[in-house]
Amino acid sequence: MNHVVILSLYRLFLSPLAWIIIALSQLITAYFFLGHLDHYLSVQDQLSTLSHPPGVGQLIIAPFYKDTALILLLLIPVISQYLLTEEKYTGSLLFLLSAPLTSAEIILGKYLASLIFCCCLLACLSIMPLSLSHGTKIDYFTLLTGLLGLVLLCTTATAIALYCSSLTQHPAIATIISLTVLLLLWHINWNQQSSLLSWLSMHDHTTRLLQGHLHTQDIAYYAIHSILFMLLTIRRLAL
């Protein structure tokens, strides 16, 4: 499995796709971050009149992380289809299947490679909210909880995207299916009227974590969905 992880990361970082994703994500999130920072500075006079004014965690970090979450949902399907569907399309996956590796080892290797790339991406993006510590006091609990929420989001989104990628040999179709499923799960509880839809909603679980609220039900949500879709992907590849 280690060989699959290393080989997948090597192919990913050797391709222009990885660097384009990193550059675009930095550019887009920097734009959002500066927008939230500008808004925070513009309401300083109003905040000074409040007895308990919200800090940078609520007005900058949490909204910035929410923007980052949506960007990740758009990027992860592209990464996953490159690691699985692209290899099926080019035929290089056949070499892995002929190697002394089980389907579980291959899928777990691809999964870990995608997560490692996402963590590298998050490490780069976290520099922006951390830079606020040079000018003001920040709530590190909110910062770390929000970062945990983004990591958990990546674990589930990657598992879903890999499963969608296993359904077809065409990279474009795999990306479209993954985006559709992820955005549906993100917006599934838009009217806030169903407890079942609220539990299924990726948006609700992620938002609580990004706001600094750590609940076991949110962690369980990501764990259940990640394991479920990983098992489905392994079964699909074994067929």
Task: Describe the predicted segments one by one.
Residues 1-22:
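Aromatic- and glycine-rich beta-strand/loop motifs that create alpha-glucan
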Residues 16, 72, 76, 101-131:
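Selective transmembrane-helix segments that form parts of the transport pathway or gating/packing helices
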Residues 16-40, 69-75, 180-186:
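Hydrophobic alpha-helical transmembrane segments of multi-pass membrane transport/permease proteins
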Residues 35-59, 167, 177-239:
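Terminal transmembrane helical anchor/hairpin motif
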Residues 60-86, 121:
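Long, hydrophobic alpha-helical segments
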Residues 83-113:
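Helix-loop-helix units of permease transmembrane domains in multi-pass membrane transporters
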Residues 127-150, 208:
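Membrane-interfacial helix-loop-helix connectors in multipass membrane proteins
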Residues 145-170, 224-230:
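Hydrophobic alpha-helical transmembrane segments of polytopic membrane proteins
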